[in-house]
Amino acid sequence: MELQTAARYRLLDELRGLDLISMMLYHGMWDVVFLFGVAQKWYTGRPGFVWQQSICWVFILLSGFCLPLGHHPFRRGAVVFGAGALVTAVTLLFLPEDVVWFGVLTLLGSSMLLTAALDPLLRRVPPAVGVAVSALLFWVTYPTMNGFWNLPGGRLALPQALYASYTTAYLGFMPKSFFSTDYFPLLPWLFLFWAGYFLHHLVGRGRLAPLRRSVCPPLGWTGRHSLVLYLLHQPVILGVLTVAFRLVRAG
């Protein structure tokens, strides 16, 4: 999630940091509602959904946009994918009722690895076409988990045979028995990542100079250390909330 470049684009770091803080607040509220039983209708309703979607859309689009700025995309992708596997292992061992299969880190790592592997082919696509097609395919495949795809004239029902296993769930076709508290399959989210990737090439490196300025350095620090902070934030928040709720209930 970090930009690996000597002359950093600080505004991108700060945008990532702001989005990460929003994610931390969202996850903190998730703990309050689902682990500590404090009902919040707005959070479980449409406002909470819009908040969650705004976080992941920015995070994934920005990750795709920033990928061409970094070095060693295969190594970076492997690290992020490994971090996703770590999250799965930890939740499976310690929070099996809230296990994470194919969460956002697994998605980002997979997208980085696939994009790095396909980069010679993707670079042949005109950037404007790439942005438009990626956005269209994101819209088409957005309801994959619900059993259909969007089409201009209506919906295309997908064969239920596709929704067969955890392997198909990784792609976006999750069976009814599948459960994950954080689920970001390749479909549709890879296309949002690619929209960011092509948007970077559409803008062009020469027009990114304004993004080097800084507006809020603390947000930049948060953005530069986003992977570590992401891995640590939920245990820390959960610990703080556990102590806080015990004190409140004891009093």
Segment roles from a protein language model:
Residues M1-G251:
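Alpha-helical transmembrane segments and their immediate juxtamembrane cytosolic regions
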